[in-house]
Amino acid sequence: MSQNKLELIKELRQRTNSALGDVKKALEATDYNIEAAIKWLKENGIVKAAKKSGRLASEGVVSAHGTPTQSLLLEVNSETDFVAQNEKFMTLVKNVTESVFKAGASTLEEALQVKVSDSETVEQALTDATAVIGEKITLRRVLASKAKEGHVLGTYLHANNRVAAVVEVTGSNSEVAKNVAMHLAAMNPEFVLVSDIPEDRMQEIKKAFEAPKDFDKKPAQIQERILSGWLDKQLGEVVLEKQPFVMEDSLTVAKYLANANAKLVSAHRYEVGEGLEKVQSNFAEEVASMTK
């Protein structure tokens, strides 16, 4: 093979991140015209993408974009963590996030129909990416939030792009709201408010109480105080508003907000792959199967 053809193969792989075999087929089918080969990959990729549609995509990233009054969290999945770190994949996620946020789409169905360019919707861009990258790429979910009057939003995206959170609080201090969103991302409590705990779950928590020595001999008022202190500690494990605040653990989240004249209204957290089954594959076996 000539040096020129090798250079074209290398360039096409860099520009499309397609598999080597697909790159060679595309160039051979287009007489080594690189722009035509890119078009060929896209056109033939629709068939490839359809074949991949039944595969499980449980890796990927979460993304977030927000202002004090509007916020968007979304999750884009790939099949492997390797692809999730790919520059082209991350550029796609950035474009999708910005486009969906700007369009104000509030459901997954609406988000998929948002235009990311003059000629392509989010859904079409994901199909193209599936074909070019070689893995199933999907927009799994979106959460669009708008602050109520007199409230403010705080949006946080962790540096690893695997966890994001949005918090709504009363007042106008978005920095305080963002700090609580960061806490939420890090601590992942089971509930936001004590009032969110179902009665059966609360009873389950209370049943775990082990009375200290001579508890029954203490006055009812003391027993109540001991039980209340124990319960607060347990709730601090599972309820956002009761947890010690990560930036100042002498305060609970609720107290931190109260000091800023704010109250917690709602909170949401996204983490990559929540609720999805993950397929464990043996890389060596996978490579061996490709060489047969």
Curated annotation (Swiss-Prot):
The protein's role, per its UniProt record: Associates with the EF-Tu.GDP complex and induces the exchange of GDP to GTP. It remains bound to the aminoacyl-tRNA.EF-Tu.GTP complex up to the GTP hydrolysis stage on the ribosome.
Protein's recorded name: Elongation factor Ts
Species, as recorded: Mycoplasmopsis synoviae (strain 53) (Mycoplasma synoviae)
Cystine residue pairs: none
Highest taxon, organism lineage: Bacteria
Predominant location: cytoplasm
GO terms for MF: translation elongation factor activity
Pfam families, per database record: EF_TS
NCBIfam families (UniProt xref): tsf
InterPro entries associated with the record: EF-Ts_dimer_sf, Transl_elong_EFTs/EF1B, Transl_elong_EFTs/EF1B_dimer, Transl_elong_Ts_CS, UBA-like_sf
Subcellular location, record wording: Cytoplasm
GO cellular component, one term: cytoplasm
Alphabetical keyword list: Cytoplasm, Elongation factor, Protein biosynthesis
Gene3D superfamilies cross-referenced by the UniProt entry: 1.10.286.20, DNA helicase RuvA subunit, C-terminal domain, Elongation factor Ts, dimerisation domain
Record-stated family: Belongs to the EF-Ts family.
Region (Involved in Mg(2+) ion dislocation from EF-Tu), start-end ranges: 80-83
